[in-house]
Amino acid sequence: WSHCCGQKQYGETPKGKSLLPRFLCARREGLIMIKKSVQLLMLSKASKSDEKVLEALMRVKAAGFDSIELNSFMVHPSSFMVRVLTKAAGMGVGSSGKRDWKGLIEKSGLSVTSLHSDLGSLERNMDSVVEEAKMFGTNRIVITGMYRYDYTSSSSVSSLATRLNKCGENLRKSGMELFYHNHNIELTLDEKRRRALDVLLLETDKENLSFELDTYWLGEAGADPKEWMKKMGERMKLWHIADRGWRSKKDQITPIVECDSVELGTGNMPLEELLDIAKVNRVEEIVLETHKNWINNDPVASLEISGKWLKERV
């Protein structure tokens, strides 16, 4: 960002060069400290007891992370249907609803990045969601997409933008900030050949809606994460990060391997370039999230490897 010309300075940089020097020069008040966070879903396997949770949280802290991002369906008991749906999506919640997350997070010395919720809950009972977020010490509430929603319809997507804008405006009155978290469905084209994520960006006000951009899902959908990060600019205040690749097998039969999330720096996502853009965008927190394919099937060991990669760069 250039204070002299009032425009962002992305452009192409020579090989081996970074956007970081320009970023540093732009900060009159000094270096921005980007916080590093872990999505609570990565700790679901450790939720069998408060003792196990605290042990995992302490390892998160030791790995260089500053905070935890919470999900409303994990911090209190969820219905049977929610547990079934999340498990089917590869996001099992374990016994997390029985744990004292507020007390355990405080004991670990970590803070809370944000609370993931859903638009319906906010529209029906905003005060309750706000109260829960404030209890955990965060002013950020994140909507993680819509279930059974027609993203191919321009009117439906525009309606969603209107609802998000109104909800964000109402949240601001309580000192809260609304975010939208993408997956891959937001790259769906409607009948006007518009992508849903573009519509949400263009038809909402920056004061009412910020974005938690998930570059893993953009890459999975075949899009260019760098271009989307540049397009979002400073409305991208949170960044969901994961690398994408595979684990090599000696007995691989075919020349086609199945991709999945892998530890940061071990896959094929252009993470160094994405990190440079995140710094230009003044991203506030980087949130690590993977659901499976962890090294030795151990999510905490996996986040420790990714934490080392982040610690060396952030």
What residue ranges belong to the model's regions?
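Glycine-rich, proline-tolerant flexible connector loops at the mouths of alpha/beta enzymes
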Residues: 69-100
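Surface-exposed charge patches
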Residues: 58, 103, 131, 169, ...
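Histidine-acidic metal/acid-base catalytic patches
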Residues: 1-67, 72, 83, 134-137, ...
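Conserved radical SAM core fold
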Residues: 74-77, 146-151, 246-248
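The substrate-binding groove and active-site-proximal loops of carbohydrate-active enzymes
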Residues: 42, 87-91, 116-119, 147-154, ...
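Catalytic alpha-helical scaffold of carbohydrate-active enzymes acting on polysaccharides/glycoconjugates
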Residues: 57-60, 94-108
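Active-site acidic/histidine proton-transfer and metal-coordination neighborhood
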Residues: 111, 116-210, 300
